[in-house]
Amino acid sequence: MRQSIKGRALRHFTLSTGKSAGRNSSGRITVFHRGGGSKRLQRKIDLKRSTSSIGIVERIEYDPNRSSRIALVRWIEGVLPGRQRKFKTIEEFALPRKILESTTATIFCLFSFSSLSSPLAQGETASLSFGSSLGFPRIAVAGAKPAFFAERMREKKIGKKTFSLCEIRKWRTHCVLWAHRIKRKAALSWQSLRQQKTLELVGAAEHNESKLKADQGSLLPRQVLAYALCSGRPSYLHASRSFYKALLPVEASRFGSLPAKPPIGEGPKDGAYKVDRAPVTYILASHQLEAGNMVINCDCSKPSKSGFLRPAQNAHTYLRFQELGRTVNKGRVEGGSQLAASWPRPPAYRHEILDLNSKVGNSIPLADIRMGTWVHDIECHPGQGAKLARAAGTYAKIIKEPASQCLVRLPSGVEKLIDSRCRATIGIVSNPNHGARKLRKAGQSRWSGRRPIVRGVAMNPVDHPHGGGEGRTKGGRPSVSPWGKPTKAGFRAGVGVGKRRI
């Protein structure tokens, strides 16, 4: 497997983690010879792979926190929520060439500014759908960085409808920043309109209030009270009724014309500021998985509508029906063959589809995997995520025909029964030569966070019970820890424990 690393990991899928240096929460050393090491960023790995979609491997990257490699996958399906493609035949599965390009991606997003009060922003709606050209409204382009939006305008003239993977970082950053900035502009425009209306209401209220000679000492600030009455907040209902009576008859018609204030932190309900999820994720790379290969996720909880991706829509029910048919056929006689032939039978297993799905890197249920197949990233419970066989070069083997429970031989040699609805990834975990590597110098061990191991006889008497003395001697006592506790297997038990047994 060639390791194609171009640039750093995506910032959206990285997070920083602290180091404990072998200490627990109370500060005591629980694991010796740990500490130091180079700085690392944790990668967010999609171990569940719950999205029923097809993806293309963009590149294979190095992960300093695990022994295997990781793959950056760009998902073709599943980016648009609520839309799924139907593939009835194998010929319809042929994808366009522009989708199979390893450096392109398409993101869905919708901007709507019909609710804004600005005359330039009203009625402007720019939609970015699957395969449509990138377009942004004026309010989003105004004041933007030329390095990001200038390329989009040039591509619009040229006719390019996708953008490169290197701009996904910019898209994630700018999409969130512009969402907050657009919200801020909308709030400012709404506040300016509300302040203008409030001043008019306050002026009319002052004119009517002077006639009624209301008690001014029991009133709240007029602007705040007028703002509360306009927005319809019930927290100011305990205020003086004279101000409300003076305000309501004059400007009662204006209350219905003013727009209601949206809750704090929420925008319009048409999805104007909704940011779609990223079209790429990190997964554990399989051996012989290279950039440009296609991988498939088959989700049992959300069966795909396509018969091409899921040969058995309900494999668990089909296997139970198959076992029932075998039990009934054991007592069948020759004369009843015609009667048995008329019984309903499940559809024949399409082995050509299973061979197509059983490619390296595909995540499919154990019920759809043939006997003798090498798998990794196995789930213990359906939908839990990969738990078994995740280290570099490890794999498990299917050693029994799929039934309600599948028998799997783990890398340790233990045979375990796992629910057939659990999913596993075809192939072996990448980087199988991880165990054969050799450290060229002591610094490589320190880079990995391992501190040197020092023998007790090489220390001083103040540091260890075995320290001191002339030459390599430990004073004739058995091996003990730095605190004087026995460390050999025969000396760990208390004195006289075996004699107490009757």
Swiss-Prot record:
Keyword S-adenosyl-L-methionine attached: no
Subcellular location: Mitochondrion
UniProt-recorded Gene Ontology molecular function terms: RNA binding; structural constituent of ribosome
Principal location listed in the UniProt entry: mitochondrion
Alphabetical GO biological process terms: mitochondrial translation
Keywords linked to the UniProt accession: Mitochondrion, Ribonucleoprotein, Ribosomal protein
Biased composition range(s): Basic and acidic residues: 463-473
GO terms for cellular component: mitochondrial large ribosomal subunit; mitochondrion
Comp. bias intervals (Gly residues): 493-502
Region of interest: Disordered: 458-502
SMART domains noted in UniProt: Ribosomal_L2 (SM01383), Ribosomal_L2_C (SM01382)
SUPFAM superfamilies in the record: Nucleic acid-binding proteins (SSF50249), Translation proteins SH3-like domain (SSF50104)
A Pfam family the protein falls into: Ribosomal_L2
Similarity comment: Belongs to the universal ribosomal protein uL2 family.
Protein name in the entry: Large ribosomal subunit protein uL2m
